[in-house]
Amino acid sequence: MCIRDRIRGQPGDSNANALSSGVLEVLKANPDLRLVADQSHEGWLPDKAMATTENLLTKFGNKIDAVICNNSGMARGVIAALDAQGLASADKVFVAGADADLVNIQYVAQGKEAAEIWKKIAPLAETAVETAVTLAENPDKDPKTLLKVDRVINNGAVDVPTIVTPVVLVDRKNLDSTIIAEGFYTHQQVYGK
């Protein structure tokens, strides 16, 4: 049995909800995985994620197999709590974050963190600009007919046409061929040499 924790971002944030929904789909498809905590963290703060992790480590006698975080900062908080218990190793506790902050990519390279989700900036920016220009040039038309919408997501108030941009799961195996090869960070920044 694998004991997992989800460290969620800001309560009600659509990104936190979308990321967490994806994690839940995986958990539901794998009944041998047990979710022991699902905690939102106001402000996406690393220190709150660290405190949550410290409490869970105490409650479960340091027997946590994985922690999935909605952003890199909270993953750093989790790793700080794990480090204090000698558990900051992807071989001991699987930790994943999202944002690919430099420190987290360094943790992936060092083996402290298992994976980061990298949202490529160029496709995000290009899609945002194309969408904004199209909407500005056609203010009286329905966005769903103008844009290549991948799906509609209800944000709790309205249905939002959504364009999905690619993300990359970065781990030790593909770190050099993704983050470094595409120039997001340099070899020097990641490895310090």
Please place each PLM-identified region on the residue numbering.
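A residue-level marker of the well-folded mature domains of exported/periplasmic proteins
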Residues: R4-K193
